[in-house]
Structures are given as C-alpha cells and as structure tokens.
Amino acid sequence: MFDKQEFVSKLVTEEKAKIVLLVMDGLGDIPVNGKTPLQAANTPNLDSLAKESDLGQTIPVLPGITPGSGPGHLSLFGYDPIRYQIGRGILEALGIGVEVGEKDVVARANFATWDGKVVLDRRAGRPATEESAKVVQLLSEKIKKIEDVEITFYPGKEHRFVVKFTGEGLGDNVTDADPQKEGHPMVWAEGLDEPSKKTARITNELIKKIAEVLKDNPKINFALIRGFSKYPDLPKFPQVYKMKAGAIATYPMYRGLAKLVGMEIIETGQTVADEIKTLKERWNDYDFFYVHVKKTDSYGEDGKFEEKVKVIEEVDALIPEIVSLNPDVLVITGDHSTPVPLKAHSWHPVPLLIWSKYTRRGLSQAFNEFECARGTLGTIHASDVMTLALAYAGKLEKFGA
C-alpha cells in the first residue's frame, strides 16, 4: 500500500525553516441569515493576509464523512486518519499527563444530566473545571475496582474527565457509551471482540455506579464514556519532517494528540492571547509550532453564532503579532467544520490559508468559506496541508530527475 507520508518524508531536507500551523477548531460553517461566522466577523487582518496568500479548502477524511477532532488533526499533521484510528481517550489521557501502560485502556468521559430515561444534557451544563474536579475526587473515593479491573479517574477541563481501566484481558474495540444527542435514550457500550466485551461490560457497570454515587446532584448525575483506546504506535513528527515541533494548546485532548506524534508540549495560559504570547516567547526554541484555538468549536457545538464570531475576531486581532515573527510559512485552518445550525461537527470542507513569500498573491480578497472555495489551492485532502507547508518553506527536494 502506498504510504504518502513515508514518500514525502524521503523528500524532506535538513533546511531550517519556521512554520506556524494555527488551528481554529471547528472553523468552517454554513450561512445563518446569509453569512457564516467568518463572513460576519470583522477580520481586517485575516482578510489582508488572504490577499497575500493562497487559499483553498480541505477534506479531513473523505467527502461526506464527518470527522472527530482526532482524525481532523492527524490529517493536518500529515497522517492518514483512516490508517491511524486513535480513540480520544488516549489523547485526553496523555494531554493531562496520565501514564498509560500495556494493561491499560483509557477512555474520555463527560459528566452529563440524566433523568433515568434520556440524556438531557451531554455536558451537564458545562460545569467549571474546579467543580468537576471535586466530583472526580468523590468518584475516586467511592469507586476503585469493578470485577478484577482497577478504575482510576482523572479530572479534565469543564465537564470532561478520563477513566483508566487497568487489568488483564481488556480490549479497546468498544463502541461509545453515549447517545451523541440530547433528548435520546442512553446507548450503552458494546464490545466488538472478546477482550473488548469485558471492557464494555465493566464500562456499563461503572456508569451505573457513577449514577448511584451522583444521584442527589441535580445536574452532574451521570457520565458518558467514549473513545476507548490503548497506546498506539505512530511515526514521530520530528523524524518524519526533520523539524523540532512544539504544541501550544490549552485543552488536554489536543496536547495529547501532539504528544502522541512526538511534539513537545509548551506550557501556556488559558486564553488565545496567552498562547500567542507563548509563541513569541518560545520562538527560537522550535522549527514548527502547532497553535490550537478551541472556542470556535465550542460555540459552534453550542449553536452560539455571535460568540463564535467574537472568537474569530479575537484571533484576528492577534494575527499581526504572529506575522511580526516573520515565519517562513503561516497556515491558518480548522480541523473540521462545526456549523452553528447543526450544533455538531460536519462533513463540510474547511477553510485553508497558506501565507509565505512564494504564494500567488492578489487572487483572493478575504478569508471565508466562499473565498476559500474559489482559491488557488482548490479542494484538497487535509493530509496534503503539511506537504504544502514544507514546500512553501523550501524543505522538499525535487522528485525525480
């Protein structure tokens, strides 16, 4: 089978370059009252940059396939998201520093609100991180083992936490214990092979125990568990692309994904401004920077149009600070689309901007979904973005005589 990443890796040179990949999570959208959030936002800096850039749009997996954030990011990093299928559990776990061993299966979990029949709120009203941490502590005291499997809880951000299952004979080929939509009955975990059936059985029992412990809490009274995974083996980004890579991200899952591919995690603050400040402070320490903005996705999932607009404007105001660093290549895109009307990830193509001194300037007027659809790069697979970034940075040899 043709391995595109391996093919590209053989063409990568030792040439020094600075590349910034700015991922605005869930950036792509569809019009509401005639405009997408990108179109409605006041973005003079992004629009000015677009006039000096090549634009296009990406397909993260395949046309019509709605990607999770894991596949969406793997694609952007140049990995085949179908070949490397990774559960969100390992990403979240690594992102918060969980040690994962050979006997472990980890999963990502949400606190939720449940009325005994249907899931009313998949995120339990997005409780504060501190509040969730107290609930996780309570669960840690009350639930330590199911059958012969040790259960360990780790707090994440807001409604999120991680569960680690440690024991013999556990598999990770388990369906999500999550209906995926509110107002629907619970969908319980199912194992798709014998070891995974054990994991599923213990997971379902665990959720029932959690519900019992939290039965008196009006909002945080249930849990959804998904993204079961063991530790996978992937080619490492620094070796593939011959670049020292640093990740600036506030949310554990994205830190975990970056760590999984071999990037170093750079500590930063909680705001986008903090992240760009960190980028400037650590500019001389890395060749490649991955910078992640989460709230564009969060507000898309919550159906909050104006809030998504404000995050885009917040990022726009910081663009001059990135440009002032004079990177060889600046890529601005999303890992997938999260349209406000859908309140969920979608299959829609994702806007893409590539800025360098080698772009065909003057062909685009603004950065939005429709200008990108008309852009010089066309519609490409997201796994080609990294190849293009390397090319624009002068880090690829010619192929063939």
UniProtKB/Swiss-Prot annotation:
Ranges in a coiled coil: none
Record-listed E.C. numbers: 5.4.2.12
UniProt cross-references to InterPro entries, sorted A to Z: Alkaline_phosphatase_core_sf, ApgAM_prokaryotes, Metalloenzyme, Pglycerate_mutase_ApgM
Keyword Isomerase included in the entry's annotation: yes
Top-level class of the enzyme under EC nomenclature: isomerase
GO molecular function: metal ion binding; phosphoglycerate mutase activity
Single biological process term from Gene Ontology: glycolytic process
Keyword hit for Isomerase: yes
Keywords, in A-Z order: Glycolysis, Isomerase
Pathway(s) it belongs to: Carbohydrate degradation; glycolysis; pyruvate from D-glyceraldehyde 3-phosphate: step 3/5
PANTHER family: COFACTOR-INDEPENDENT PHOSPHOGLYCERATE MUTASE, METALLOENZYME DOMAIN-CONTAINING PROTEIN
Family, as annotated: Belongs to the BPG-independent phosphoglycerate mutase family. A-PGAM subfamily.
Function: Catalyzes the interconversion of 2-phosphoglycerate and 3-phosphoglycerate.
Protein name: Probable 2,3-bisphosphoglycerate-independent phosphoglycerate mutase
